[in-house]
Amino acid sequence: MVQKIGILGAMREEITPILELFGVDFEEIPLGENVFHKGVYRNKEIIVAYSKIGKVHSTLTTTSMILAFGVQKVLFSGVAGSLIKDLKINDLLVAIQLVQHDVDLSAFNHPLGFIPESAIFIETSESLNALAKKVANEQHIALKEGVIVSGDQFVHSKERKEFLVSEFKASAVEMEGASVAFVCQKFGVPCCVLRSISDNADEEANMSFDAFLEKSAQTSAKFLKSMVDKL
Protein backbone atom coordinates (compact mmCIF):
# COMPACT_ATOMS: atom_id res chain seq x y z
CA MET A 1 0.00 0.00 0.00
CA VAL A 2 1.40 3.39 -1.01
CA GLN A 3 1.89 5.77 1.90
CA LYS A 4 0.20 9.15 1.38
CA ILE A 5 1.80 12.15 3.07
CA GLY A 6 0.35 15.65 3.19
CA ILE A 7 2.81 18.54 3.35
CA LEU A 8 1.51 21.98 4.21
CA GLY A 9 2.76 25.53 4.43
CA ALA A 10 0.85 28.76 4.90
CA MET A 11 2.50 30.81 2.16
CA ARG A 12 3.85 30.18 -1.30
CA GLU A 13 7.33 31.01 0.01
CA GLU A 14 7.07 28.13 2.47
CA ILE A 15 6.27 25.40 -0.07
CA THR A 16 8.44 26.59 -2.98
CA PRO A 17 11.63 25.14 -1.45
CA ILE A 18 9.74 21.94 -0.63
CA LEU A 19 8.66 21.41 -4.23
CA GLU A 20 12.20 22.12 -5.42
CA LEU A 21 13.88 19.82 -2.90
CA PHE A 22 11.80 16.76 -3.77
CA GLY A 23 12.70 17.15 -7.43
CA VAL A 24 9.79 15.17 -8.86
CA ASP A 25 7.12 16.02 -11.41
CA PHE A 26 4.04 17.27 -9.60
CA GLU A 27 0.52 17.18 -10.98
CA GLU A 28 -1.38 20.35 -10.09
CA ILE A 29 -4.91 19.66 -8.88
CA PRO A 30 -7.26 22.61 -8.22
CA LEU A 31 -9.70 22.29 -5.32
CA GLY A 32 -11.49 24.85 -3.16
CA GLU A 33 -9.76 27.78 -4.86
CA ASN A 34 -6.40 26.26 -4.01
CA VAL A 35 -3.85 24.14 -5.86
CA PHE A 36 -2.61 20.79 -4.56
CA HIS A 37 0.66 19.43 -5.94
CA LYS A 38 0.59 15.63 -6.20
CA GLY A 39 3.70 13.58 -6.88
CA VAL A 40 5.47 10.30 -6.12
CA TYR A 41 8.73 10.32 -4.18
CA ARG A 42 10.52 7.09 -3.19
CA ASN A 43 7.32 5.07 -3.48
CA LYS A 44 5.42 7.58 -1.36
CA GLU A 45 2.60 9.74 -2.65
CA ILE A 46 3.08 13.29 -1.46
CA ILE A 47 0.53 16.08 -1.61
CA VAL A 48 1.92 19.60 -1.17
CA ALA A 49 -0.07 22.82 -0.79
CA TYR A 50 0.02 26.21 0.84
CA SER A 51 -3.19 27.11 2.59
CA LYS A 52 -2.85 30.90 2.66
CA ILE A 53 -2.51 32.74 5.96
CA GLY A 54 -4.76 32.14 8.95
CA LYS A 55 -6.64 29.45 10.81
CA VAL A 56 -9.67 29.27 8.52
CA HIS A 57 -7.56 28.78 5.39
CA SER A 58 -5.36 26.16 7.04
CA THR A 59 -8.42 24.31 8.36
CA LEU A 60 -9.89 24.14 4.86
CA THR A 61 -6.66 22.93 3.27
CA THR A 62 -5.94 20.32 5.94
CA THR A 63 -9.48 18.96 5.71
CA SER A 64 -9.21 18.81 1.91
CA MET A 65 -5.94 16.89 2.15
CA ILE A 66 -7.48 14.31 4.45
CA LEU A 67 -10.90 13.89 2.84
CA ALA A 68 -10.15 14.48 -0.84
CA PHE A 69 -6.63 13.06 -1.08
CA GLY A 70 -6.64 10.52 1.74
CA VAL A 71 -3.35 11.55 3.32
CA GLN A 72 -2.31 9.39 6.26
CA LYS A 73 0.12 11.85 7.84
CA VAL A 74 0.34 15.64 7.79
CA LEU A 75 3.60 17.56 8.09
CA PHE A 76 3.48 21.34 8.39
CA SER A 77 6.58 23.33 7.45
CA GLY A 78 6.88 27.06 7.91
CA VAL A 79 8.10 30.01 9.95
CA ALA A 80 7.14 31.47 13.32
CA GLY A 81 7.94 34.27 15.72
CA SER A 82 10.03 33.49 18.79
CA LEU A 83 8.58 34.23 22.22
CA ILE A 84 11.59 33.18 24.30
CA LYS A 85 15.27 34.10 24.41
CA ASP A 86 16.40 30.52 23.74
CA LEU A 87 14.89 30.60 20.23
CA LYS A 88 16.94 32.62 17.76
CA ILE A 89 16.41 33.50 14.10
CA ASN A 90 16.58 30.34 11.92
CA ASP A 91 16.31 27.96 14.89
CA LEU A 92 14.01 24.96 14.42
CA LEU A 93 11.11 24.16 16.73
CA VAL A 94 8.73 21.20 16.74
CA ALA A 95 5.35 21.70 18.41
CA ILE A 96 4.51 19.23 21.17
CA GLN A 97 1.25 21.07 21.80
CA LEU A 98 -0.58 23.95 20.13
CA VAL A 99 -3.13 26.49 21.34
CA GLN A 100 -5.52 28.95 19.70
CA HIS A 101 -4.38 32.00 21.66
CA ASP A 102 -7.10 34.31 20.32
CA VAL A 103 -10.04 32.21 21.56
CA ASP A 104 -11.65 34.12 24.43
CA LEU A 105 -14.79 32.84 26.16
CA SER A 106 -13.78 34.28 29.52
CA ALA A 107 -17.17 36.03 29.72
CA PHE A 108 -18.54 32.54 30.45
CA ASN A 109 -15.78 31.76 32.97
CA HIS A 110 -13.83 29.61 30.53
CA PRO A 111 -10.02 29.86 30.46
CA LEU A 112 -8.44 31.54 27.46
CA GLY A 113 -7.95 29.20 24.52
CA PHE A 114 -10.77 26.89 25.61
CA ILE A 115 -13.80 25.96 23.50
CA PRO A 116 -16.56 23.76 25.02
CA GLU A 117 -16.30 20.08 24.01
CA SER A 118 -12.65 20.68 23.16
CA ALA A 119 -9.40 21.37 25.00
CA ILE A 120 -6.96 24.25 25.34
CA PHE A 121 -3.88 22.29 24.31
CA ILE A 122 -3.94 20.30 21.07
CA GLU A 123 -1.52 17.38 20.92
CA THR A 124 0.65 16.43 17.96
CA SER A 125 1.96 12.98 17.02
CA GLU A 126 4.47 11.51 19.47
CA SER A 127 5.88 9.19 16.80
CA LEU A 128 6.40 11.96 14.23
CA ASN A 129 7.92 14.22 16.89
CA ALA A 130 10.26 11.39 17.88
CA LEU A 131 11.26 11.02 14.23
CA ALA A 132 12.00 14.74 14.09
CA LYS A 133 14.27 14.43 17.12
CA LYS A 134 16.02 11.42 15.57
CA VAL A 135 16.69 13.32 12.34
CA ALA A 136 17.95 16.29 14.33
CA ASN A 137 20.36 14.11 16.32
CA GLU A 138 21.69 12.45 13.17
CA GLN A 139 22.26 15.83 11.51
CA HIS A 140 23.58 17.50 14.68
CA ILE A 141 20.77 20.06 14.59
CA ALA A 142 19.65 21.69 17.83
CA LEU A 143 15.93 21.05 17.37
CA LYS A 144 13.87 22.65 20.13
CA GLU A 145 10.44 21.49 21.27
CA GLY A 146 7.64 23.34 22.98
CA VAL A 147 4.19 24.89 22.85
CA ILE A 148 3.27 26.92 19.77
CA VAL A 149 0.34 29.32 19.88
CA SER A 150 -1.71 30.24 16.81
CA GLY A 151 -4.06 33.13 16.15
CA ASP A 152 -5.45 35.31 13.40
CA GLN A 153 -3.10 38.17 14.15
CA PHE A 154 0.57 38.89 13.47
CA VAL A 155 2.09 39.35 16.92
CA HIS A 156 4.53 42.25 17.03
CA SER A 157 4.62 43.65 20.55
CA LYS A 158 6.58 42.93 23.71
CA GLU A 159 3.42 43.05 25.83
CA ARG A 160 1.63 40.41 23.76
CA LYS A 161 4.74 38.21 23.76
CA GLU A 162 4.95 38.33 27.53
CA PHE A 163 1.25 37.54 27.84
CA LEU A 164 1.48 34.46 25.58
CA VAL A 165 4.43 33.11 27.54
CA SER A 166 2.72 33.77 30.87
CA GLU A 167 -0.68 32.38 29.86
CA PHE A 168 0.32 29.36 27.77
CA LYS A 169 4.05 28.79 28.48
CA ALA A 170 4.49 29.19 24.73
CA SER A 171 7.78 29.16 22.84
CA ALA A 172 6.64 30.54 19.48
CA VAL A 173 3.68 32.15 17.76
CA GLU A 174 2.21 31.82 14.26
CA MET A 175 -1.17 31.78 12.51
CA GLU A 176 -2.01 28.22 11.37
CA GLY A 177 -0.52 25.36 13.37
CA ALA A 178 -3.23 24.90 16.00
CA SER A 179 -5.99 24.60 13.41
CA VAL A 180 -3.97 22.09 11.38
CA ALA A 181 -3.31 19.99 14.49
CA PHE A 182 -6.97 20.26 15.55
CA VAL A 183 -8.27 18.92 12.22
CA CYS A 184 -5.74 16.09 12.24
CA GLN A 185 -6.64 15.15 15.80
CA LYS A 186 -10.36 14.98 14.99
CA PHE A 187 -9.75 12.78 11.93
CA GLY A 188 -7.17 10.59 13.67
CA VAL A 189 -4.35 11.59 11.31
CA PRO A 190 -0.84 11.93 12.81
CA CYS A 191 0.46 15.47 12.58
CA CYS A 192 3.80 17.23 13.02
CA VAL A 193 4.18 21.02 13.05
CA LEU A 194 7.70 22.21 12.31
CA ARG A 195 8.64 25.88 12.44
CA SER A 196 11.81 27.84 11.74
CA ILE A 197 12.13 31.16 13.55
CA SER A 198 11.84 34.20 11.27
CA ASP A 199 11.36 37.00 13.81
CA ASN A 200 11.11 37.80 17.51
CA ALA A 201 7.42 38.79 17.55
CA ASP A 202 8.39 42.26 18.77
CA GLU A 203 8.06 45.79 17.43
CA GLU A 204 10.56 45.00 14.65
CA ALA A 205 8.91 41.70 13.70
CA ASN A 206 7.52 42.88 10.37
CA MET A 207 10.96 43.92 9.12
CA SER A 208 12.67 40.80 10.47
CA PHE A 209 9.97 38.56 9.00
CA ASP A 210 10.47 39.97 5.50
CA ALA A 211 14.25 39.75 5.78
CA PHE A 212 14.45 36.17 7.04
CA LEU A 213 11.32 34.53 5.56
CA GLU A 214 13.08 32.85 2.63
CA LYS A 215 16.05 31.56 4.63
CA SER A 216 13.89 30.30 7.49
CA ALA A 217 11.49 28.60 5.08
CA GLN A 218 14.46 26.84 3.44
CA THR A 219 15.67 25.61 6.83
CA SER A 220 12.30 24.13 7.71
CA ALA A 221 11.82 22.62 4.24
CA LYS A 222 15.19 20.84 4.25
CA PHE A 223 14.50 19.33 7.64
CA LEU A 224 11.02 18.22 6.61
CA LYS A 225 12.39 16.44 3.55
CA SER A 226 14.83 14.56 5.79
CA MET A 227 11.85 13.39 7.83
CA VAL A 228 9.97 12.23 4.73
CA ASP A 229 13.05 10.27 3.65
CA LYS A 230 12.69 8.18 6.82
CA LEU A 231 8.93 7.61 6.71
Label each residue range with its predicted role:
Residues 2-63, 69:
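N-terminal short beta-loop-beta anion/metal-coordinating cradle
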Residues 64-68, 84-87, 182-190:
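Alpha-helix C-terminal capping segments
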Residues 83-168:
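Mid-sequence, gly/pro-rich, charge-dense loop/helix-turn segments that line enzyme active sites
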Residues 201-231:
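His/Asp/Glu-rich mid-to-C-terminal helical/loop segments that flank catalytic regions of hydrolases
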